[in-house]
Amino acid sequence: MAELKRVALMGLLLESNSFAPVSDEQAFRSLCYLSGDEILNDIALPNGELPAEIPSFYNAMENTSIGWKPLPIVVLASEPGGPIDQVFFKRTKDDMESRLRTAMPLDGVYIAE
């Protein structure tokens, strides 16, 4: 049997412009901020929090002949707003990087944006 392809799932979704107030952590937590197994659990729900890109990719991969293992990292999304708060972005980026390093080795990374 072939080895399963290890694919990280992650995303950061924000439509922003400089005229709107800064998008802080609460802006993301109020719409979608999931990490690790929370992502896989949400995919299984009929109307989860995740942006459509994540469950759509997951379901497409499940319907291929490619054996794969999804490795959920972090997915966050906000309503349209201003630029992301710099301190929150750095903390989130560092968390994503740490989780990616822990998930190594990887065959691919799916990033929803």
Question: What is each of the regions a protein language model found here?
Answer:
Residues 20-21, 74, 113:
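Proline/serine/threonine/glycine-rich intrinsically disordered regulatory regions
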Residues 1-4, 63-68, 100-107:
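Glycine-rich phosphate/diphosphate-binding loops that line cofactor/substrate pockets in enzymes
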Residues 66-78:
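Short beta-strand elements in bilobed, periplasmic/extracellular small-molecule ligand-binding domains
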